[in-house]
Amino acid sequence: MIAVGNDATWHAPPQAALCTAATLARMITRRRIQHCPACGAKAEYHVPPNDNRERAVCTACGEVHYENPINVVGTVPVWGDQVLLCRRAIEPRHGMWTLPAGFMEFGETTAEGALRETIEEAGAHVEMQDLFSVLNVVRVGQVHLFYRARMLDATLDPGPESIEARLFCEDEIPWDQLAFRTVRQTLELFFEDRRRGTFGTHAADIG
């Protein structure tokens, strides 16, 4: 995961740690395709026929390559009145707290990806529940989706990307140590819904 300003983005290129926030935002927003993935020839950006925006077009085979937003999927795991958070073992935001989440992989649904990330980062056994938040991080081309999840037991076994995994009551949440805006907003919405006694699905734009 990385952060651009106060926004949240997952798994930036390795060189990102050396970039300014503005440079990093440009790098992630436009992942320039230099060569055609189909044939290896040079790709150039222009507006193809019957389109309305620039695409990477192969100069040899004519293949048009699309660059689309990335899905980040995670959970809000709950045990009783407590919520599970993981403390990051990797840069950036090393040592800060986050909900278990990461890139969706090919061949899985958003819920399957969120479950996988929860197991990988926290070693938690959960039952997946409804989709809770959909947060569009427009500036960096990502969509973050968090599901509510009921923990089946209190066993935790953090993976290599987590220093530790811990359960927090609402008044114990380390708000000033949360890694990403999407995590903070999701937690705020979760506790608001819990106080009302009903959970919805929330959508918002960030950046």
Regions found by a protein language model. Give the residues of each.
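NUDIX/MutT-family hydrolases
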Residues: P158-L189
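A short, amphipathic alpha-helical segment
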Residues: E188-R196
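N-terminal leader/linker segments that precede catalytic domains of diphosphate-processing enzymes
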Residues: I2-P92, F103-E120, A124-T155, R196-G207
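Conserved acetyl-CoA binding element of GNAT-fold acetyltransferases
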Residues: W97-G102
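Short, functionally important structural connectors and interaction interfaces within domains
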Residues: A89-E91, M96, D130, R148, ...
